């Protein structure tokens, strides 16, 4: 838990994930990039001062740290996946976490419904890209393949945070309307 509460560690995971490969598990190679969106709304959703929303977000985010410079929020591309940035963020996180007594590698339990081939393939893709970018000596994604009932009970139907005995779960949500 301590590692996931560290901003630099979360940013390392963010830059380590190959979203195109992850999407290809469901949408195929040709359709993989077509579904990619870095923001919840289209980057052209609204404008202010003659600039699209995506451009405004890029500018504001780049001002928060060098790691965000060069990140584009245009649709149909993955400008977040960057192994060099992932490693740089991990180096910062590792120093901070080791000073708190955290041991490496960090093991992250990731729950997935084993009855869904697509979800299992996506979980394996996530595991592969994160471990390849950051190194298994630093981060290991432990994919927990559960039955549908067990996965639902551990995630969707858990009554309290204490009942959620995992580190990561990927679900989907998007706005119903663009306004």
Residue spans for each PLM region:
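Periplasmic-binding protein-like
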Residues: 1
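Periplasmic binding protein-like
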Residues: 129-179
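Append "and occasionally in soluble cytosolic enzymes with long acidic Gly/Pro-rich linkers
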Residues: 4-132
């Amino acid at each position: 838990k301590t590692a996931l509460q560290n901003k630099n560690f979360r940013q390392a995971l963010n830059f380590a994930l190959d979203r195109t490969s992850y999407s290809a598990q469901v949408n195929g190679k040709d359709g993989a990039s077509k579904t990619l969106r870095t923001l919840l709304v289209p980057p052209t959703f609204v404008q202010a001062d003659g600039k699209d929303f995506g451009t405004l977000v890029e500018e504001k985010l780049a001002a928060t740290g060098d790691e965000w410079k060069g990140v584009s929020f245009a649709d149909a591309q993955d400008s977040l996946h960057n192994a060099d940035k992932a490693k740089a963020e991990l180096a910062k996180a590792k120093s901070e976490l080791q000073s708190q007594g955290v041991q490496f590698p960090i093991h992250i339990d990731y729950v997935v419904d084993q009855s869904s081939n697509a979800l299992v393939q996506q979980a394996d893709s996530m595991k592969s890209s994160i471990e390849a970018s950051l190194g298994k000596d630093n981060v290991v994604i432990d994919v927990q393949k559960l039955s549908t009932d067990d996965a639902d009970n551990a995630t969707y139907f858990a009554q309290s945070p204490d009942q959620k005995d995992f580190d990561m779960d990927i679900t989907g949500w998007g706005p119903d309307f663009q306004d």
